[in-house]
Amino acid sequence: MSYKSGFVTIIGRPNVGKSTLMNQIIGEKIAIMSDKPQTTRNKIQSVYSQEDFQIVFLDTPGIHKPKHKLGEYMVKVARDTLKEVDVVLFLVDEGQKIGPGDRFIMEQLKDIKTPMFLIINKIDKMNQEILNEVCGLFEETGLFQRIIPISALEGANIDTLIKQIVSFLPEGPQYFPSDMITDQPERLLVAEIVREKLLHYLDQEIPHGIAVETSMMKQRPNQDIVDIQATIYCEKKSHKGIIIGKGGRKLKGVGKSARQDIEKLLGSKVFLELWVKVNEDWRNQSRILKSLGYE
């Protein structure tokens, strides 16, 4: 039996369920999930292995019109990834006709020779008539080799999606060990978990003005405890107070929720300290972006 392997990227407008889809396939929380757009900032590499194939998923930031240096970085990562892969999955939301955001992305795709699948997400929320209409609209573009409706949250049709991806992969080597699910360092995953909790707890105007850096992560000698310090950067002094909350309650809530997920990730008890620092306009400062892992 021949072994197949290759690289797949998931693209789409911000917040259509790209991270949810990848986490559903891999079976672990690898990419940050939030109800706020543009939550994926780094190219997350995840691995799905079976006996006769291996798929390496690159979950990129949503393609959008950038407003600052961080936004430019996010869009550049997404565009560059299209050139590196064997299959592109274009994920769209349920019940929405082709809007300006989708047209903008398809403009970026029209000269790409990589096989492309249209993945219609959240079919659990739409009826067959709407689904047929959405399929027809995208089929008319002639961009897609496959159109596959799914529910990333509930896992509907994920098996079909995997089979179709594998059918387009070339024969190739096993790039990663079969038990490996991500190449992301634990420090980055810890920072992403903290940022996810901040996105959940904070008001709409603040989340994309924050970043999280794991400044210290150390196993206690002869103990099943990991000490972690994470620094939360925000752009305004007023935001620092909002993040901390009255009597520190909001930051404590973020810390408690993050600690529980980090303990699941590491399989150890965790002592987590969170610090909040003001760094004005960090999203436009190349030095700061580089220190936070944005090349």
From Swiss-Prot:
Q: Where in the cell is it found?
A: Cytoplasm; Cell membrane
User: Positions of the region G4?
Assistant: 121-124
Disulfide feature: none
Return the annotated region ranges for G2. Answer: 38-42
Q: Which SUPFAM superfamilies does the protein's record reference?
A: P-loop containing nucleoside triphosphate hydrolases, Prokaryotic type KH domain (KH-domain type II)
Name any Gene Ontology BP term: ribosomal small subunit assembly
* Membrane association type: Peripheral membrane protein
Residue segments, region G5: 150-152
- Residues bound to GTP are 12-19, 59-63, 121-124
Q: Where is this region: G3?
A: 59-62
InterPro entries reported for this sequence: G_ERA_dom, GTP-bd, GTPase_Era-like, KH_dom-like_a/b, KH_dom_type_2, KH_sf_prok-type, P-loop_NTPase, Small_GTP-bd
Spell out the molecular function terms from Gene Ontology: GTP binding; GTPase activity; ribosomal small subunit binding; small ribosomal subunit rRNA binding
Q: Which residues form a coiled coil?
A: none
Domain (KH type-2): give its ranges. 202-280
NCBIfam families, alphabetized:
era, PRK00089.1, small_GTP
Q: How does it assemble?
A: Monomer.
Q: What is this protein called?
A: GTPase Era
From which organism does this entry originate? Alkaliphilus metalliredigens (strain QYMF)
Lineage, highest ranks first: Bacteria, Bacillati, Bacillota, Clostridia, Peptostreptococcales
